[in-house]
Curated annotation (Swiss-Prot):
Residues 26-35 have a biased composition (Acidic residues). Residues 1-39, 80-107 are annotated as: Disordered. Mg(2+) 1 binds at residues 418, 431. Pfam families: TTL. This is Tubulin polyglutamylase ttll-4. Residues 1-18 have a biased composition (Polar residues). One of its GO terms (molecular function) is protein-glutamic acid ligase activity, initiating. It is an enzyme of class 6 (ligase). Monoglutamylase which modifies tubulin, adding a single glutamate on the gamma-carboxyl group of specific glutamate residues of target proteins. Involved in the side-chain initiation step of the polyglutamylation reaction but not in the elongation step. Preferentially modifies beta-tail tubulin over the alpha-tubulin. Involved in side-chain glutamylation of tubulin in sensory cilia. Together with ttll-5 and ttll-11, required for male mating. Mg(2+) 2 binds at residues 431, 433. The gene is ttll-4.
Amino acid sequence: MSSGYSSAPSVSHTSSEADLNRIESYEDGVDEEASDEQRMCGLSELVTSCLTSSKSSRQKDSFEDDDDVPIEIVGTLKKSKSKKKKQCPPNITIEKKNGNSSPFLKSSQFTDVPPTIRFYTKGTKVTKPARKIQSRLTWCHNSLLPIVMRQTLSASHFTIVDESLFHIGYWGRHLKSAQYKALQPHQKVNHFPGAFHIGRKDRLWMHIRNRLEHFGEEFEIMPFTYILPTDRQELLKYLETDVNRHVIIKPPASARGSGITVTRKPKDFPTTATLVAQHYIERPLTINRAKFDLRLYAYVPTFEPLRVYIYDQGLVRFASVPYNPSVTNISNKYMHLTNYSINKLAEADGIANKPVPKWALHQLWDYFDQMGVNSQKIQKEIEDVIVKAFISCEKPIREHMSRFLEQEFICYELFGIDIILDEDYKPWLLEVNISPSLHSGTSLDVSVKAPLAKDVLNLAGIHVPPSFDKLHTADYSCRPRNGTKTREQLVKEASWVAAYRDQHGAIDNRIFKRLTPEDTRALVEFEDELDRIGDFKLVFPTAQTAHYQKFFAEPIYMNILLQQWQIAQEGDRSIGIDRLEQLCRQKHMQSDQEISF
């Protein structure tokens, strides 16, 4: 397929307040199944008593030794000789599996780092926590909270409560940017401010096109797109050169197939309303003569440093009519569109004589393997597309977050990634949804989405709101990261970013010669996150992704640190984990700032 790619002017990432209000009036790539009367849940403040320290004294464990020699901080990663058992925060007991009951808490790998709540699928018997803890296990009710998520929360003894009551979690429609400022340190929400930069089709294309200008075919990951009405003349010129060319017209912030048409008629191209027109892939790969696309799930816990996970399972969605394109049937949505929300109606409309099929992702890989097609190669290429999409959009999202978010740790996000394969098995990014539907109308949906909901909440690292003594626990997740860095941290970051530029991206293990408290917090958080990975796969950063650093709009210290950490850890993760554990024992993470709430 001819890509139709061409150079483009640079794109500004800056949004005025007026633009922001206009953009946030749209539903940014939401594809949740829900009614028209869905309402935004206003997030209440946490109760003061849950943010104050408990009066209980900290007991000294028998394995502590005041004469312990500190681990060497200078030098590259060195394995600790210490055999000391790590300790949990006081007043938090990590219970072991009790008979047929699964544990409620997941301990950290590191001393004084709080445990996280474990989540399970429906039907799992989970050890009941103490009444004092259970009273804090509350989740904000809203009409977009899917059933599989409710069941997962219920299994771990959460209660769904009204938005006006104390709650520690929220899953629903994206918030307005200003609402993030009211969030409290122990609340968790499933969106980032500024996620519209990847969830809106026009913004997503603008940012990918910007990277395309710098890196050429490396970023030919999305069908060429026109933003209407601005690019209307460019689009008309493209269509005039070949009568067989068509484009797919989409609203920039819709989902579930709403408002999509395949056309080449100028009357369908607006002169006022904002739409996007995407090159139609004329030769898609088909199975049993039907066009199909892939819904994958990507999870991002933070944009600084950027980390991207992809879920092991997903869905393959088929068109309900055999693919046989011609001028006469170009408007047949059941042939050309693969959205399940559209094709599930084909049987009722008399277009199909049986329900539209849907596969689990592993069925597609098995099918390819049986056909002699290298499914592993296709999966790697899909991962490449997804990582590049996030890299294209990370800078404007980070900039937006810096304006509206004081604690990045309170946010996480699950994205729905739609991919189509052409006849050469090349993956193309169609769009990114910031509220992928977890509605489970079939047994196949449940088999994919119920474990997904459980694994997302586990990766999010949700803590019991603390009542223990913060002076003796590394409750680093509750501390603002913006504007509180020490001079030591700022100097180190500036020097390594400068070295990265001077050495054209070359970095080595000297970056670990002195791990600052901020470095240590970031690495501890990352290692514990990997310990809760479930059926997700980390695709960025890995030991093999160093070459992606050049694609970022600007070098970011934490990205560089984490990338080098992954390279250093490739042989034996226990070496780095042991070093971090020794730093935790020395209370290194708390040494750079006052603890106040």
